[in-house]
């Protein structure tokens, strides 16, 4: 075949590799403290614009409902929503009327949102490729992003597999204390007043 005499292979990026612009962090928590840790992190990051990934539609709705009830600018995105509801949620999220989108992986497929600051794994996915795909939604176009995971002791073994696939270490950090949250919010408020 005269077409394949000197083939050239072109590769764009590496399959299932993380971006260098994303900082990966995990927080080791008790399973019962997962929601409180999420709230603490959101409070610590007032300018957050991100997606919280949950395992199930039910968990997605519960987390979003709890965030809304607690005064956060959030909404859910999952398969039980009608197409009109999904479109409305995505429109509000893209226009930044919402800071937090709580979603399942299936519902979030194909959505493309610019300038996400954070991806939060409320639960680690079972497959490392899903983690890579989730984290790749932030840190795009020369911007930096953060992918954080709330894990409990039964999920610790997954971190090593993800690190191997990423080719980098996932930092371990402590959930911010109430004092740290207050200080951060105070400094953020002062910065806004000075502008």
Language-model segments: which ranges?
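Conserved helicase RecA-like core
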Residues: 1-195
């Amino acid at each position: 075949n005269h077409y394949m005499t000197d083939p050239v292979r072109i590769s764009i990026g590496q399959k299932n590799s993380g971006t260098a612009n994303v900082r990966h962090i995990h927080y080791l928590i008790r399973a019962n403290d997962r929601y409180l840790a999420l709230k603490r992190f959101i409070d610590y990051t007032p300018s957050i614009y991100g997606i919280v990934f949950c395992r199930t539609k039910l968990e997605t709705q519960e987390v979003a409902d709890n965030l809304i009830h607690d005064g956060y600018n959030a909404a859910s995105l999952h398969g039980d929503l009608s197409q009109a509801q999904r479109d409305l949620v995505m429109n509000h999220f893209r226009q930044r009327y919402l800071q937090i989108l709580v979603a399942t992986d299936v519902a979030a497929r194909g959505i493309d949102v610019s300038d996400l600051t954070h991806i939060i794994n409320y639960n680690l996915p079972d497959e490392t490729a899903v983690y890579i795909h989730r984290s790749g939604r932030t840190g795009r176009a020369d911007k930096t992003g953060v992918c954080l995971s709330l894990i409990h002791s039964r999920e610790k073994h997954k971190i090593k597999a993800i690190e191997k696939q990423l080719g980098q270490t996932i930092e371990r950090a402590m959930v911010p204390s109430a004092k740290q949250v207050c200080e951060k919010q105070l400094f953020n408020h002062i910065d806004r007043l000075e502008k």
